[in-house]
Design a protein with these regions (language model features):
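N-terminal strand-loop element at the rim of the active site
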Residues: 6-72, 158-167, 174
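A conserved mid-protein helix/loop that constitutes part of the nucleotide-sugar donor-binding site
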Residues: 16-21, 209-234, 251-257, 338
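Donor nucleotide-sugar binding/catalytic pocket of nucleotide-sugar-dependent glycosyltransferases
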Residues: 59, 146-195
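A short, well-ordered alpha-helix in the C-terminal region of glycosyltransferases
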Residues: 197-200, 346, 353-368, 380
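Nucleotide-activated donor-binding/catalytic signature segment of Leloir-type glycosyltransferases, i.e.
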Residues: 257-273
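Short hydrophobic beta-strand element within catalytic cores of glycosyltransferases
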Residues: 310-313, 323
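Conserved acidic donor-binding segment of nucleotide-sugar-dependent glycosyltransferases
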Residues: 325-326, 330-337, 346-352
Length: 396
């Protein structure tokens, strides 16, 4: 008898970006993998070709990123329930805040069907230092949804401690994993020749100090603070040869273009848009900047470190898992433009020996986050779910 599992997220690009190894594991265990997301968003991902190549069954649902778009999400909830019942889904693995909300509400509605519900929290919204409204609303929502959760997966220590205070469904389990795991074959230091050729292709001069950020252009990713830091450096009168490139796209692109113009940075800032050659760009950087206000873990920061490129990061629960100030980069408050400006200056002033030492510390910092560790935990989780499904079929 075929086993069916549903992976539920908000946007279609999530699966091939972050869940490829999980899909392979599930298929190896004999599952037919269904994937439900809003296939019309984001608009800058062109087609479903990569999803089809993964061998999953694709389902469009009208899920919205915002939990406050009630009409769309109510419709999406009913679509998820219909999928579960039509395809006899035996387990579902939901991701993203709204995916986790709808997936677990669907699990509640389908309780008699015995669906095993897994939720990966890629960063609770009731984190330390979060706005009071987050603490009041999101914690209560998570506390309520926990009772319909069989397996809760978190990706940082702060969230793990918070998860232990929640009451899951009877027999529920909590796991901490190192994110989706680093692909060491893809993210590794470039050779000197690869770096020279890459910088030449990007139009970066040999004397330029090249900064890179990777991430969607939105409010949380906080790229504005880097622009403010660069403007401060420029106003100081001591203007070094700095180039800043942003890899990513999103709803803030027009705002970013406006801010770049207003701050007089058009000659040094480049919006590269969405790219699928991130290692080639990151490896050419002298440093990366990761200014997010909130991160569950922050793979962009880890990927930079894995390439031996130090990071100027915002302090948040995700970066605390792997960043050490003045060891593998520099860490500042997410709203501290002067701090980020200082970090850029300090990074530029490193001697060759200091830069070599920092590179070694970068590579050491990412060892606990290698993909093998994350895959081993997920394999154990999915195997336990499979055993549970098979026992239910046997005695059901």
């Amino acid at each position: 008898m075929e086993k069916h599992i549903l992976i539920l997220t908000t946007t279609k690009d999530f699966l091939w970006k972050f869940e490829g190894e999980n899909v392979k594991t599930l298929q190896h265990l004999g599952y037919v993998v269904h994937y439900a997301a809003n296939m019309n968003e984001p608009a800058y991902i062109a087609d479903n070709r990569r999803l089809r190549q993964m061998g999953v069954r694709i389902h469009h649902i009208d899920i919205a990123r915002s939990p406050f778009l009630f009409q769309e999400n109510q419709k999406a909830l009913q679509q998820v329930v219909e999928l579960i019942r039509r395809y006899h889904i035996q387990a579902q693995h939901c991701h993203t805040p709204v995916g986790g909300l709808l997936g677990r509400l669907a699990g509640k509605q389908c309780a008699d069907d015995g669906v095993v519900v897994i939720y990966t929290a890629h960063g609770f919204h009731f984190y330390k230092g979060a706005p009071l409204m987050n603490q009041l609303v999101y914690y209560r929502v998570e506390k309520y949804l926990a009772r319909y959760t069989d397996i809760l997966i978190v990706i940082n220590e702060e969230d793990y401690r918070s998860a232990l205070k929640l009451h899951l469904k009877k027999g529920g389990q909590i796991y901490k994993i190192p994110g989706v795991g680093l692909n060491g074959g893809r993210f590794r230091p470039l050779t000197d020749e690869e770096r020279r050729q890459g910088r030449r292709a990007l139009g970066i001069g040999p004397e330029d100090f090249f900064l890179v950020s990777v991430g969607e252009l939105n409010g949380n990713k906080n790229h504005r603070i880097v622009l403010e830091a660069l403007a401060q450096i420029r106003r100081s009168g001591n203007v070094p040869l700095i180039r800043y490139g942003l890899c990513g796209d999103g709803f803030f692109r027009k705002r970013m273009e406006d801010w770049i113009g207003e701050l007089g940075l058009a000659d040094i800032v480049t919006l590269y848009g969405y790219r699928d050659d991130i290692p080639a760009v990151l490896g050419c950087a002298d440093a990366s900047i990761f200014p997010s206000k909130r991160e569950g873990l922050g793979m962009a920061g880890l990927e930079s470190l894995a390439m031996g490129v130090p990071v100027i990061a915002a302090d948040n629960r995700g970066t605390r898992e792997y960043m050490e100030h003045e060891k593998n980069g520099f860490v500042y408050r997410c709203d501290d433009a002067a701090g980020f400006a200082e970090g850029i200056r300090m990074m530029m002033s490193l001697t060759s020996a200091q830069r070599a030492e920092m590179k070694l510390r970068c590579l050491d910092a990412v060892k606990p986050f290698e993909k093998a560790y994350a895959c081993a935990v997920m394999r154990r989780i999915y195997t336990a779910v499979t055993r549970r499904i098979e026992e239910a079929d046997q005695y059901g």
